[in-house]
A protein has these predicted regions:
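A contiguous pocket-lining binding segment that forms or flanks enzyme active sites
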Residues: 49-55
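C-terminal lobe/tail of nucleotide-utilizing enzymes
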Residues: 68-128
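ATP-dependent carboxylate-amine ligase catalytic core
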Residues: 1-37, 44, 56-65, 69, ...
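Active-site phosphate/pyrophosphate- and oxyanion-stabilizing loops and adjacent acidic/basic residues
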Residues: 40-41, 97
Length: 128
């Protein structure tokens, strides 16, 4: 990956669209250029806010809190949390509750298992 090429394409997209979603597939510490440039570098380079997609299964509390701590330490703005693949299990409800209590994040969405769309109203509420 050549960073200058990525920058150029991003600038071209910004001219064409008012909103752009940049997916940080795999997480903050995934290398885009091994040992040189990571997903978090890309986020910081463009000063992008983050919507953190979280699981709800066992281990989600630790994983989410570690990532939130890393975002805070790096000075990266969190837009909110999206709890993905929610199946309605009692432990998922508890995990979501604990994450929200520990993180003090107020802005979140819950995406149910198999849910294909998010309503315009949900998106408006999330980003405003």
């Amino acid at each position: 990956i050549e960073i200058e090429n990525v920058k150029k394409h991003f600038e071209d997209l910004k001219k064409k669209y008012s909103n752009i979603i940049v997916e940080g597939a795999g997480g903050l510490y995934v290398p885009l250029i091994r040992d040189k440039f990571y997903i978090y570098d890309l986020i910081k380079m463009w000063n992008l806010p983050v919507v953190l997609v979280c699981g709800t299964k066992v281990g989600s509390i630790n994983h989410t809190m570690l990532t939130l701590n890393a975002l805070k330490t790096m000075g990266i703005k969190l837009e909110g949390l999206v709890f993905n693949n929610y199946k309605g299990q009692f432990f998922e409800d508890d995990n979501i509750k604990v994450i929200l209590e520990l993180s003090k994040v107020k802005n979140y969405l819950i995406i149910k298992n198999g849910q294909k769309e998010i309503s315009d109203e949900e998106i408006e509420t999330f980003f405003n």
